[in-house]
From Swiss-Prot:
Tagged with keyword Transmembrane: no
Pfam families: Ribosomal_S11
GO terms, molecular function: rRNA binding; structural constituent of ribosome
Organism the protein comes from: Rickettsia africae (strain ESF-5)
Name of protein: Small ribosomal subunit protein uS11
Length: 127
């Protein structure tokens, strides 16, 4: 008559967080963190079923934001600060998708790295 009792782990409630959006030429990666930088939820366009060139579309970024914010809302996240980086075309649609999720946005910060004559860029495509 040995019975094991399962104890359900209580999720932390985090009301203030940071959203890191990395929009590259090939993919979009979204990470929700708390103020200390501990990851709450993350998602990417490739992980949401988009493959190849479709990962770099604005629609894929929108779906990625929706999935990641669903996970983050389970922790009680209400107020966010946005840090967006990268040269991708999906930056604008990712921001619009975040505004549609009913979060209180305190700040928007562009953290794109700017090369001061760093590595040589890839050659131009000849189609």
């Amino acid at each position: 008559m040995n019975q094991t009792v399962k104890v359900k782990k209580k999720k932390k409630t985090i009301t203030l967080g940071v959203v890191h959006i990395r929009a590259s030429f090939n993919n979009t990666i979204v990470t929700f963190t708390d103020i200390q930088g501990n990851t709450i939820a993350s998602a990417s366009a490739g992980g949401n079923g988009f493959k190849g060139a479709r990962k770099a579309t604005p629609y894929a970024a929108q779906v990625t934001i929706d999935r990641a914010s669903e996970k983050a809302k389970e922790y009680g996240l209400k107020t966010i600060s946005i840090r967006i980086g990268g040269p991708g075309a999906q930056r604008e649609s990712a921001m619009r998708a975040l505004f549609g999720q009913n979060f209180v946005v305190t700040s928007i910060l562009d953290v794109s790295s700017i090369a001061h004559n760093g590595v040589r860029p890839p050659k131009r495509r000849r189609v």
